Design a protein with these regions (language model features):
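Gly/Ser/Thr-enriched, mixed-charge loops and adjacent short helices
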Residues: 2-3, 89-218
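Short, highly selective alpha-helical patches that border small-molecule cofactor pockets
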Residues: 4, 8, 34, 38, ...
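Glycine-rich phosphate/diphosphate-binding loops that line cofactor/substrate pockets in enzymes
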Residues: 7-24, 156-163
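Residue-level detector of functional hotspots within protein domains
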Residues: 9, 77-79, 95
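N-terminal small/polar loop signature for handling phosphorylated ligands or for N-terminal nucleophile
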Residues: 13, 17-88, 183-226
Length: 226
């Protein structure tokens, strides 16, 4: 908890020293404590005069990148540890372009973080007070719907015959299910089987050693349904 607060204070100090918009989008995935860390980051940002735009539920990382640009933010934070084992969680920072920050920017943010005392150097505001002050705002459904539409608009071909496609999908107990189902429905793919044991978000990832689709063990249950 203290590490997340310290990192966020450093990020806030960095952003406040630039000409970038004083607004940061935050998302988290299904990893343990993701919601808690999201709220703590929002509290710190609000206390530093930065508007925290928070997804109200877990969302995949690309949705965070989209929100940064869609909402005109100066940066973004995703509470995630990608494909690492369940014991980990992480803190990824994205630039105003929605991309992961460059090494040059990372060095500047790290320098700001290192100056922060995690006990006495962090500004905090009560979460509800931040909401009432308009410094903590919820990202609405239109943002995510427009994200799905933007992905759909990149499709290749006219979709002829796609209704015959039979698909097995697994979110690996992560966060992709909602967006993937919406996108497949728009494409006209109706024969979709979701791996039942891996459908529900679960930060313990009980069905595989770690949620990396590049390893066979993670995809084994899906392969068995094919």
């Amino acid at each position: 908890l203290y590490t997340v607060r310290k990192a966020t204070q450093g990020l806030a100090d960095y952003l406040n020293a630039t000409d970038l918009p004083k607004k940061i989008a935050i998302a988290h995935d299904s990893r343990n404590n993701g919601e808690l860390f999201t709220r703590e980051a929002a509290r710190v940002l609000a206390a530093n005069g930065i508007t925290a735009c928070v997804y109200p539920r877990l969302e995949p990382t690309p949705a965070l990148s989209w929100a940064v640009r869609y909402l005109g933010c100066g940066a973004g934070v995703c509470i995630t540890a990608s494909h690492n084992p369940a014991k980990y969680n992480g803190y990824k920072v994205y630039g105003a372009d929605g991309c992961q920050i460059t090494l040059e920017v990372a060095d500047k943010i790290l320098a700001a973080i290192e100056k922060v005392d995690c006990f006495d150097g962090v500004k905090l505001v009560d979460y509800e007070a931040g909401v009432q002050a308009g410094r903590i705002v919820s990202i609405d459904d239109k943002c995510l719907d427009d994200f799905v539409q933007a992905v759909y608009d990149q499709r290749v071909g006219d979709g002829t015959g796609i209704e015959q496609l039979k698909l097995v999908y697994t979110p690996l107990n992560g966060t992709g299910l909602e967006c993937v189902k919406k996108l497949l429905a728009k494409l006209g793919v109706t024969h979709v089987t979701v791996v039942p044991e891996q459908e529900t978000p679960d930060g313990n990832f009980p069905t595989c050693p770690y949620p990396n689709p590049e390893i066979r063990e993670a995809m084994q249950k899906g392969l068995e349904l094919c």
